C-alpha cells in the first residue's frame, strides 16, 4: 500500500483496491499499482451491463482480444480495457453521456495505467479485434434483439464459453505473465519485479 503523508485523497474521489492501493481519480498515479488488483477487478466486472448469460467478465473479453491480434500487439490488447477495473459502462451509456466527455474524464486514469504498465493500445488492429469480440459475445451470450449492429465485423468462429470470475482472474494473470515482456519501457513502466507487486 502506498502512503502519501502530504496529501490524503478524498474518499469521494479515491478508489480503494483489493491490495489496499488507493487511486485518486482527480490526480491518478498508478505507480506501484499491482496487476493483481486490475485482474481481480476486471474479473469481477460483467460485460454488457451484466446482461450476458452465462455471466461474462471484462477479464475474459480482454484475454480474447489479446488472442485475436498480431503477437506483438497482444500485450497492449490484453490491457486495452484495464481502466474498466473502475466499472465497465456499456457503450450506449457512454454515447448518452457523450463519448468525448467520457474519454476526456477517463484520459488521465488511462494515461496513468499506460505509464504504469507500459502499453499503447490505440491501434486499429486492437479496435478491430475488440469489435470482433463484441460481435462474438452478441452471438454467443446475448438474446436476439431488434437492434442494428451493422458497425460490427463478423464474429470469431470459436464459441465463447464463460469461465466465471475466479478462473477469469487466473486466466488474465497467466496471460499477463506470458506477455509482459512486450511492455514498452519507453512508456516509463516500472521494473518487471514491481509489476507483480
Across the structure, where does each feature detected by a protein language model lie?
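Metal-dependent phosphohydrolase cores
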Residues: 1-197
Amino acid at each position: 500500500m502506498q502512503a502519501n503523508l502530504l496529501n490524503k485523497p478524498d474518499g469521494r474521489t479515491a478508489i480503494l483496491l483489493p491490495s489496499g492501493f488507493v487511486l485518486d481519480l482527480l490526480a491518478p498515479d498508478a505507480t506501484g499499482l499491482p496487476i493483481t488488483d486490475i485482474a481481480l477487478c476486471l474479473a469481477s466486472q460483467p460485460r454488457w451491463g451484466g446482461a450476458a448469460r452465462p455471466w461474462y467478465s471484462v477479464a475474459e473479453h480482454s484475454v480474447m482480444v489479446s488472442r485475436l491480434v498480431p503477437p506483438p500487439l497482444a500485450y497492449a490488447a490484453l490491457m486495452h480495457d484495464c481502466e474498466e477495473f473502475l466499472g465497465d459502462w456499456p457503450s450506449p451509456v457512454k454515447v448518452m453521456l457523450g463519448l468525448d466527455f467520457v474519454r476526456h474524464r477517463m484520459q488521465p486514469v488511462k494515461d496513468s495505467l499506460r505509464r504504469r504498465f507500459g502499453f499503447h493500445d490505440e491501434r486499429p488492429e486492437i479496435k478491430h479485434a475488440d469489435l470482433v469480440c463484441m460481435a462474438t459475445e452478441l452471438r454467443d451470450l446475448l438474446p436476439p434483439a431488434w437492434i442494428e449492429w451493422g458497425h460490427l465485423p463478423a464474429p470469431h468462429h470459436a464459441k465463447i464459453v464463460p469461465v466465471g470470475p475466479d478462473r477469469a482472474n487466473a486466466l488474465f494473470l497467466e496471460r499477463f505473465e506470458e506477455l509482459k515482456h512486450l511492455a514498452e519501457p519507453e512508456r516509463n513502466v516500472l521494473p518487471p519485479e514491481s509489476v507483480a507487486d
